[in-house]
């Protein structure tokens, strides 16, 4: 067997149909594009939201401004006024607030706000305090202690940038 004897298997290669090249081809006149109209013409079709000339839905909806911050941190909020009946010997922590059902979710940071009055000295540990809450706690003789909160971010990354894989490392 020599190179000039090599042939593809019988029936494995079909000739491509040349459209619009005579009646024998079976694809004459409109060339498989149907009747006339925008879809029969060359070039890209109408834009994605095109509705045949009527005012499209996208234009009829109210215009949305701004953006959604994907790094936003939501807090469980507790007002100073809800700590009035709290025993002074017990520290106020996210765990004790959860046990007394003043907060619902334990995986969220806690912020203390200054709505209401506080008349006993309390040691309050939270992730964030409003300025008025801190002022009311310290005026009552208590302490406002900040806790650190480590935010769990879910990365969409699948490892290093593939375009940088073959780059020279210096």
Curated annotation (Swiss-Prot):
GO molecular function: rRNA binding; structural constituent of ribosome
Biased composition range(s): Basic residues: 13-26
Region Disordered, annotated ranges: 1-50
Assigned keywords, A-Z: Ribonucleoprotein, Ribosomal protein, RNA-binding, rRNA-binding
Membrane-spanning intervals of the chain: none
Keyword Transcription in annotation: no
Record GO biological process: translation
Basic and acidic residues biased stretches: 1-12
InterPro entries tied to this protein: Ribosomal_uL15 (IPR030878), Ribosomal_uL15/eL18 (IPR021131), Ribosomal_uL15/eL18_sf (IPR036227), Ribosomal_uL15_bac-type (IPR005749), Ribosomal_uL15_CS (IPR001196)
Protein family membership: Belongs to the universal ribosomal protein uL15 family.
Chain's role: Binds to the 23S rRNA.
Description of how the protein assembles with itself and partners: Part of the 50S ribosomal subunit.
Protein name (record): Large ribosomal subunit protein uL15
Species of origin: Chloroflexus aggregans (strain MD-66 / DSM 9485)
Gene responsible for this protein: rplO
């Amino acid at each position: 067997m020599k190179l000039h004897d090599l042939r593809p298997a019988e029936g494995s290669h079909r000739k491509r149909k040349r459209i619009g090249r005579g009646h024998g081809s079976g694809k004459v006149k409109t060339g498989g594009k149907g009747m006339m109209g925008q879809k029969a013409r060359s070039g890209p079709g109408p834009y994605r939201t095109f509705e045949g000339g009527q005012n499209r839905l996208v234009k009829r909806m109210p215009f949305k401004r701004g953006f959604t911050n994907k790094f936003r941190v939501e807090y469980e909020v507790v007002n100073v006024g809800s700590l009035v009946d709290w025993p002074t010997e017990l520290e106020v922590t996210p765990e004790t607030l959860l046990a007394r059902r003043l907060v619902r979710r334990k995986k969220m940071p806690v912020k203390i706000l200054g709505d209401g009055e506080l008349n006993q000295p309390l040691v309050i540990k939270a992730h964030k305090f409003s300025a008025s809450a801190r002022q009311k706690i310290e005026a009552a003789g208590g302490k406002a202690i900040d806790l650190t909160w480590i935010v769990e971010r879910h990365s969409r990354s699948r490892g290093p940038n593939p375009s940088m894989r073959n780059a020279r490392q210096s």
